[in-house]
């Protein structure tokens, strides 16, 4: 996690969360973001850990508390690609997408992921640039 103070609040970067809601909650409790803070999340919110759905809920809630700038990670890109392509869905599942689906407690699969989660993923940017920093997900 990188942190910088800016004129209108703090600029904070948070790296790969990978479905670990408790870790994200601990970070957010420690930094206690406010409306003047900008948080850049660097992608890979989902897969591998047990709580991907909850992580997306936390990030959506966080966007109401501060300026949130979500960056697209390769795991989110795989999930988005899997919506319309069965081969992409198989690849995504083999890279941790099965854990993401399990976090929704749905047997029916990808069709039961809430629309607000898809909207959040679609809002993710490829990068964010400030006067001093360029933020991106480095796995490309």
Task: Give the location of each predicted region.
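Short hydrophobic-aromatic micro-motifs
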Residues: 13, 128-129, 133-138
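Active-site neighborhood of divalent metal-dependent phosphoester bond hydrolases
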Residues: 48-130
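Histidine-centered divalent metal-coordination motifs
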Residues: 18, 74-75, 137
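Beta-sheet entry/capping signal
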Residues: 10, 38, 67-69, 133
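Residue-level preference for short coil/turn positions at secondary-structure junctions
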Residues: 7-8, 35, 64, 129-131
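N-terminal active-site segment of His-dependent metallophosphoesterases
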Residues: 1-56
């Amino acid at each position: 996690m990188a942190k910088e103070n800016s004129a209108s609040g703090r600029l904070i970067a948070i790296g790969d969360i990978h479905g670990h809601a408790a870790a994200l909650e601990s970070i957010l409790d420690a930094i206690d973001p406010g409306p003047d803070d900008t948080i850049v999340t660097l992608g890979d919110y989902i897969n591998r850990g047990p709580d991907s759905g909850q992580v997306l809920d936390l990030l959506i809630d966080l966007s109401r508390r501060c300026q949130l700038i979500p960056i697209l990670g390769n795991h989110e890109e795989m999930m988005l690609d899997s919506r319309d392509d069965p081969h992409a869905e198989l690849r995504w599942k083999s890279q941790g997408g099965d854990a993401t689906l399990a976090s929704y407690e749905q047997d029916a699969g990808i069709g039961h992921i809430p629309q607000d989660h898809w909207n959040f993923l679609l809002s993710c940017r490829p990068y964010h640039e400030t006067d001093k920093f360029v933020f991106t997900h480095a796995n490309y």
